[in-house]
Amino acid sequence: MGGSSYDVLRKQARSLENEIDLKLVAFSKIGAGSGGGGSGGLGGVDTSPLLGEHVFDSLSEEIEQMLEKLSSLNESMSDLPASGAAAMHTLQRHREILQGYRQEFNKICANHTMRIEREELLRGSGLATSSGSPSISGLNRREMYLKESGHLNSASHLVNDQINIAIETRDHLHAQRQAFKRLQTRFNDISNRFPLISSLIQRINIKKRRDSLILGAVIGFCVILLLLYAFN
């Protein structure tokens, strides 16, 4: 009886896993905005985003209930007496599948939330026109992303221009720094030359004094000779 109950629960779990798998595929498409009630056959234009959100929310609740049911089935199987290593392996596999489904479900919900916030941000920044509709007002997502890409490109060009200005300013400052270095070198050379000039002038003055002394001595000697000659 226990084995029969286990087989029934296992079949129910497999059937529910298949249903959840299909639901997650549809849920992912609706969350990405590429399917569901958000398209009205007008070339990809979102004509009824509120309906798409309603479908997403409804499917989200349905998948949550299915995941809870699958978790309950797994718990029921684990409560049955162990019937071998194969059964334990199968139960572990069902738990891993459930965990994978939960992760995928949370990932889809998070991506959908980010997409909605992104569209709200674009709408608030003026990338989408406002005509009273809660949608993106006639602009499909491709047009909206193209406009956003244009704004990003403009911002990128502006940043590049600012970077070029900064580089030119840096080069100009570097050139000024080199000019100041050259001036400083010249001043140092001049200051180093002044002691040499001063020393040269001092030597010239010493030589003049020495020549004056020699000339004075010669003149004095000549005067003495003349006086001696005159008195004799």
Curated annotation (Swiss-Prot):
Residues 6-23, 52-80 form a coiled coil. Keywords: Coiled coil, ER-Golgi transport, Golgi apparatus, Membrane, Protein transport, Transmembrane, Transmembrane helix, Transport. GO terms for cellular component: cis-Golgi network; Golgi medial cisterna; Golgi membrane; Golgi trans cisterna; membrane; SNARE complex. It is a single-pass type IV membrane protein. The keyword Protease does not apply. It is found in: Golgi apparatus membrane. InterPro entries: Golgi_SNAP_su1. GO terms for biological process: endoplasmic reticulum to Golgi vesicle-mediated transport; Golgi vesicle transport; inter-Golgi cisterna vesicle-mediated transport; intra-Golgi vesicle-mediated transport; protein transport; vesicle fusion. Pfam families: V-SNARE_C (PF12352). It comes from the Eukaryota. The chain crosses the membrane at residues 212-232. One of its GO terms (molecular function) is SNAP receptor activity. Residues 1-211 are cytoplasmic. Involved in transport from the ER to the Golgi apparatus as well as in intra-Golgi transport. It belongs to a super-family of proteins called t-SNAREs or soluble NSF (N-ethylmaleimide-sensitive factor) attachment protein receptor. Belongs to the GOSR1 family. Component of several multiprotein Golgi SNARE complexes. This is Golgi SNAP receptor complex member 1. The gene is Gos28.
